[in-house]
Amino acid sequence: MGTAKEKKQQIVAEFKDKLSQAQTVIFSNFSGLTVEDDTILRRKFREANSEYKVYKNTLMTIAAKELGYGDDLIKYFEGPTSVAFGYDDPVAPAKVLVEFMKDHKGIELKAGLVNGKLVTVEEIKALAELPSREELVAKALGSMKAPITNLVFVLSGTLRSLLYALNAVKEKKQAEA
């Protein structure tokens, strides 16, 4: 085990790493959450392939300053602050938090970062309304598949009509013979 200073340096390095890698970072006040609610929330984040952690405000401030963030972000590091990280789907952490807030009053949004840009509570709520990455991919694939499917139906209908016409000509020739 290292000294307390080394542990704090590790935590700062971890937070900096997560802050740099995440597409979405959301800061919230969790002071009204029960242990049971906190456990439920953490499970929801895991299910959404996101992370939810609590760091000391002083360590977050050090990390944010080292990454070049100013007081516009650091001012939110007051009181109990939890952090949600979204790596693959930038919408997932916002969806989880906003959805959770509908049934649990013990948590409130402070601010967030989307691709390194500071966003407000209203912008986080708007982000939560967007479709997830999976939904967008499904819609895109569906819209690409639809014209191909329609083309197959049109071509098979045309081919069927040609076969009927050829069959009619064949039957006419047989009747004449």
From Swiss-Prot:
One Gene Ontology cellular component annotation held by this UniProt entry: large ribosomal subunit
UniProt-listed Pfam families: Ribosomal_L10
Record organism: Thermoanaerobacter pseudethanolicus (strain ATCC 33223 / 39E)
Keywords of this entry: Ribonucleoprotein, Ribosomal protein, RNA-binding, rRNA-binding
SUPFAM superfamilies from the UniProt entry: Ribosomal protein L10-like
UniProt subunit comment: Part of the ribosomal stalk of the 50S ribosomal subunit. The N-terminus interacts with L11 and the large rRNA to form the base of the stalk. The C-terminus forms an elongated spine to which L12 dimers bind in a sequential fashion forming a multimeric L10(L12)X complex.
Family: Belongs to the universal ribosomal protein uL10 family.
Gene Ontology molecular function: large ribosomal subunit rRNA binding; structural constituent of ribosome
Protein name as annotated: Large ribosomal subunit protein uL10
GO BP term (any one): translation
NCBIfam families: PRK00099.1-1 (NF000955)
Function of the molecule: Forms part of the ribosomal stalk, playing a central role in the interaction of the ribosome with GTP-bound translation factors.
